[in-house]
Amino acid sequence: MLKPLKKAVKIRKPEPGLIIHSDKGAQMRSSKYREFLSDNLLIPSYTSLNHSCDENAAQESFHASLKKECLYQHTVRNYIEAYSLIYNYIENFYNGKRIHSSIDYLSPCAYESMIKNA
């Protein structure tokens, strides 16, 4: 989790206070992960132990889309195939082309561009 987060922060240069969503996974127990968040003024956010899907609806929705639109459509034989499939889905489709009703039917990249240029 830390390597892609470092890459995202380096490329996107988020404003201080950006909330990073998690599900209380192993990354939240990692001192390196927590230190990276702190050093970059990022705020950890994760669901409670007895969470409902509403607590982290955006992340739950993303995972549902990833499964339906990508993973269930392919037979993955190894880690490299899985990594490539997921990377391409996120970078080439989900962020750049897939429209989202929650952001005025824009793709995440188009929405971010609109916000930055406002």
Q: Residues of each region from the PLM?
A:
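Charged DNA-binding/catalytic regions of mobile-element recombinases
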Residues: 1-118
